[in-house]
Amino acid sequence: MDIRKEYLDFFKSKGHEIITSAPLVPDDATLLFTNAGMVPFKSIFTGDVPRPNPPIRTSCQTCIRAGGKHNDLDNVGYTARHHTFFEMLGNFSFGEYFKKDAISYAWEFVTEVLKLPKDKLYVTVHEKDDEAYELWQKFIQKDRIYRFGDKDNFWAMGDTGPCGPCSEIFYDQGSEHFNSDEDYMGGDGDRFLEIWNLVFMQFERSKDGTMTPLPKPSIDTGMGLERVTAIKEDKFSNYDSSLFMPLINEVAKLCHKQYEYKTGASYRVISDHIRSVTFLLAQGVNFDKEGRGYVLRRILRRAVRHGYLLGIKEPFMYKLVDKVVELMGEHYSYLKEKKEYVKELIKLEEERFLATIVAGLDLFNEELAKTSSNVFSGEVAFKLYDTYGFPLDLTADMLREKGLSVDEAKFDALMNEQKARAKASWKGSGDAAKESGDFKTLLEEFGENKFIGYDNLKSSSKVLALLNSEFKRVNELKNGEIGYVMLDSTPFYAQSGGQCGDTGMLGENQALDTKKYFGLNLSMIEAKNSIKIGDIVLCEVSLNRLEIRRHHSATHLLQAALRNVLGAHIAQAGSSVEADKLRFDFSHPKPVTKEELEKIENFVNEAILKGAPAKIEIMDIQNAKKSGAIALFGEKYADKVRVLTLGPSKELCGGTHVENLNEIGSFFIVRESGVSAGVRRIEAVCSKAALELSKEFRKEINDIKDSLKGADPLLSIKKLKDEIKSLQNDLKNASNTKDLDVKDINGVKVVVSKFDGDIKSKIDELKNKFDKVVVFLAGVKDGKVSLGSGSKNTSIKAGELVKTVAPIVGGGGGGRDDFATAGGKDESKIDEALNAATKFISEKL
């Protein structure tokens, strides 16, 4: 049974509109991730947004609980129900139906669609909710209805705001399977399992605790798909269900060990975490050092470490993405589009962590052996985090298995010190002034002012309001004062969608910039003469707008070219459009090759040469997406959107553009670079800026020719390269003749010495020179000690040698049997380290 589909179809038959799952990154600054089905509707429940039409909706919402207040990470894998990623089925009424219908719908779905046995079902209500208690008796015996207090059966969004009693449906898994002291209705055992929570939002709680009945009470319900699937399939753990076992079986194949529930926590951790990682990456969250990206990194690294426990010591998580897409790609089609991109990002991150995990685990185990109390050193935990990439909760996870904890206070202190150093030069951004500005009163008085600049670069407009530099309302801006002007209608485009704000003249005053604040289009001016509320001013947008719109249209063509050349996984991660340049950030796991860049550039220029008129359509959002228009993932759009078609490009966009592609003239890529893990950047120019750049290039080429006295630059460059190569060979030969102290021990060449050059290159050189050789070199640069060891065709293991000697100079490190490196702090101990290396080698040989 496809429970997800059955649920949505059932509520659709009851008049509910099916809403697509909102992004995992919510439009809510108070939340790290979308962690419940009601999150996308929060502003409707609070009354900040008008109730929709129809006012009853249903959804299957993807959720993440792995950070912040709602964090299930530590429990995942060790319990039957906890997950970092899950799907929440829900039906919602915004002032339409209430308890009677909510209870009736729930009972009908559970008993007639899911066909769960009625004799296995129990219900709870709030102890004071007589209405719900009476309503339930129409469907279930009174002795199966339990009344509990606020702790169990009252829900609130916060200390203030909408709240109300709730009613929960429970499923009895049987006393033959669960018989602990807590296995009773209301206990903490697993016998009676909550499957559905119906929240009756009927009060508004004020700061003093007073609860006032809402004029239009609402319904918010939630049922976990993973939990109800397990029940329907008669499984006692979510992980035994068809949602997880295919993934667990894949893990078993990778580690070549059979899965057993009692000892299988690592399998469950991996099967859960790969779902979170896949969805977050597919939705545009990337691995990072902070914020959501760091939570993503923590989840993956925790899974990699559990793979390590299973004996998997190479990248493997990326191999599980195919199975996630197979299981969930039909409902979440973007998983199919982003599959290869997600796999590449995961593999790169796995390789990055696996490169340090051995050294990190060695440090962890060394400190563990020294730990005499039940508390692990916070300093070492911080070093594991800072040097080896071990998130604190990963270290805590490993300690929990040993019955220990970590000194989090010391870890936090060191982390705060590091953050303080990083932010020492930060001076603020003025956002506080914007937050406290008089925008709300302007919105209440005038509403949002109209932009009329798609077709007009000039207008005669009325000054509705003026704000000073602190965003406070004033009646007048005097000569020399900087402030903001709100016009009744404005031809100035406010910075949005990556396009910079317009400049120009506003009467006799220069418009320095235009931005949108809380829906208000405001132009920043430096007053030349007095400007007052009620003035009628002649507005004229700078001709820079013509170049801006050319670069904006070129940006759309660039995205179409990227998707054509690199693949459908390309998604915008940021952009900047100005009069003389454009910048476009996009999701891609590796650098774009020269050949690919050439294809991208050619694609754009061919579209420009062909020419095509801009086509603008106003469509409802669903039809726009169905038509193939590209939308920013996670962006909130109005019900009606502006769809722009420019030749091969079709996007949702409210910016200004050319009327025909041939207005762009030409397009030239200036550079390609990396921004962060999985995000690349292309900077480019078009139109006049491209012409100016071509002139600069021509001048540079002519200057090179002049310096070469007319010779062919390419031939001259080849000649210079040949000379450089010859000199490098001479230098290499010279370095070979400068013998280090080479000894012979039982037929093995042994080199133990100080060395100030490139240690790795010298070790490679000596390994190439001798058939059997052991090398140990030590050098100092910028006060830091560098150690390196190499071994070829001997019994000496370079990694073991380095690991033994490094502590002498106050360092640590390791590596392979044939090559290893380490760092240290105490250069005064180099001679002692060299003696120790000589002794180690002599004893082994």
UniProtKB/Swiss-Prot annotation:
Source organism superkingdom: Bacteria
Required cofactor names: Zn(2+)
Keyword Cell cycle assigned: no
Name used for this protein in its record: Alanine--tRNA ligase
Single GO MF annotation: alanine-tRNA ligase activity
UniProt cofactor note: Binds 1 zinc ion per subunit.
Transmembrane portions of the chain: none
Domains: entry comment: Consists of three domains; the N-terminal catalytic domain, the editing domain and the C-terminal C-Ala domain. The editing domain removes incorrectly charged amino acids, while the C-Ala domain, along with tRNA(Ala), serves as a bridge to cooperatively bring together the editing and aminoacylation centers thus stimulating deacylation of misacylated tRNAs.
Keyword Transferase: no
Annotated EC: 6.1.1.7
Position of the signal peptide: none
NCBIfam families in UniProt: alaS
Catalytic activity: tRNA(Ala) + L-alanine + ATP = L-alanyl-tRNA(Ala) + AMP + diphosphate
Taxonomic lineage from the root: Bacteria, Pseudomonadati, Campylobacterota, Epsilonproteobacteria, Campylobacterales
InterPro entries reported for this sequence: aa-tRNA-synth_II/BPL/LPL (IPR045864), Ala-tRNA-lgiase_IIc (IPR002318), Ala-tRNA-ligase_IIc_anticod-bd (IPR018162), Ala-tRNA-synth_IIc_core (IPR018165), Ala-tRNA-synth_IIc_N (IPR018164), Ala-tRNA_ligase (IPR050058), Ala_tRNA_ligase_euk/bac (IPR023033), DHHA1_dom (IPR003156)
Localization per record: Cytoplasm
Example of a GO cellular component annotation carried by this entry: cytosol
Positions with a binding annotation for Zn(2+): H552, H556, C653, H657
Family, as annotated: Belongs to the class-II aminoacyl-tRNA synthetase family.
Record GO biological process: alanyl-tRNA aminoacylation; negative regulation of DNA-templated transcription
Keywords carried by this UniProt record: Aminoacyl-tRNA synthetase, ATP-binding, Cytoplasm, Ligase, Metal-binding, Nucleotide-binding, Protein biosynthesis, RNA-binding, tRNA-binding, Zinc
Name of the coding gene: alaS
Physiological role: Catalyzes the attachment of alanine to tRNA(Ala) in a two-step reaction: alanine is first activated by ATP to form Ala-AMP and then transferred to the acceptor end of tRNA(Ala). Also edits incorrectly charged Ser-tRNA(Ala) and Gly-tRNA(Ala) via its editing domain.
